[in-house]
UniProtKB/Swiss-Prot annotation:
Classification via CDD domains: Ribosomal_L7_L12
GO cellular component: cytosolic large ribosomal subunit
Membership in a protein family: Belongs to the bacterial ribosomal protein bL12 family.
Function comment: Forms part of the ribosomal stalk which helps the ribosome interact with GTP-bound translation factors. Is thus essential for accurate translation.
One GO BP: translation
Protein name, as recorded: Large ribosomal subunit protein bL12
GO molecular function, one term: structural constituent of ribosome
Record has Ribonucleoprotein as a keyword: yes
Originating organism: Helicobacter acinonychis (strain Sheeba)
Amino acid sequence: MAISKEEVLEYIGSLSVLELSELVKMFEEKFGVSATPTVVAGAAVAGGAVAESEEKTDFNVILADSGAEKIKVIKVVREITGLGLKEAKDATEKTPHVLKEGVNKEEAETIKKKLEEVGAKVEIK
C-alpha cells in the first residue's frame, strides 16, 4: 500500500520542532540541497542604482516654517490646498507639514514661490 501525500503532510504536521529540524537536515544530506534562502546581493544593488539615476517626477511640498506673516501664509495655503480656514491654520502651526504630495516639479516650484513670497520657508522633496 502506497502512502498518500496527505498522510505525509499529516505526519510532518505532528512532528515536534526538534524532529522537524532533524528531518530537514536529513533532506539536505540525502538530496544535496540547502534549506537556507539564497540572496542575490548584486540585483538589489543594481536596482538601487537604477532608481537613483532616473529623474524624480513626483515631489512633496513641505511647509518648513510659516514665518512672521502667518495670516498671509494661511491664505496661500488655503488657495493651494483648498483646505478650510481651521485646517489651513493648523497646517501652518504644525510645521513641518506636507502641503501637497506627488506633484510635478513645475507645480512644486510654483507653490514654493507663492509661499516664499509671503515669508514662509518651503522644502521640496
